[in-house]
Swiss-Prot record:
Protein name stated in the entry: Conotoxin Vc6.3
GO cellular component, one term: extracellular region
Localization per record: Secreted
Signal peptide (residue range): 1-22
Keywords, comma-separated and alphabetical: Disulfide bond, Ion channel impairing toxin, Knottin, Neurotoxin, Secreted, Signal, Toxin
Tissue expression per record: Expressed by the venom duct.
GO molecular function, one term: ion channel inhibitor activity
Propeptide regions on this chain: 23-50
Natural source organism: Conus victoriae
Disulfide-bonded cysteines: C52-C66, C59-C70, C67-C75
Length: 76
């Protein structure tokens, strides 16, 4: 009986936490699906295809395109 109560409380807590931390529950999925559909129609728009600078290449601290971190204008 105690285990059942603990499980119910845990499920309710996790459900409430999911709704509380959601970005935009009103149209979040609609935007997500439209972005995914756009990326399927235009593969160049996918963020997975973006190039990043490798280790030791020059970078801008504010607009970093490094694969790792940009420290003192050099990618690490």
């Amino acid at each position: 009986m105690k285990l059942t109560c603990v499980m119910i409380v845990a499920v309710l807590f996790l459900t409430a936490n999911t709704f509380a931390t959601a970005d935009d529950p009103r149209n979040g999925l609609r935007d997500l699906f439209s972005i995914a559909h756009h990326e399927m129609k235009n593969p160049e728009a996918s963020k997975l295809n973006e190039k990043c600078y490798g280790f030791g290449e020059a970078c801008l601290v504010l607009y970093t395109d490094c694969c790792g971190y940009c420290v003192l204008a050099v990618c690490l």
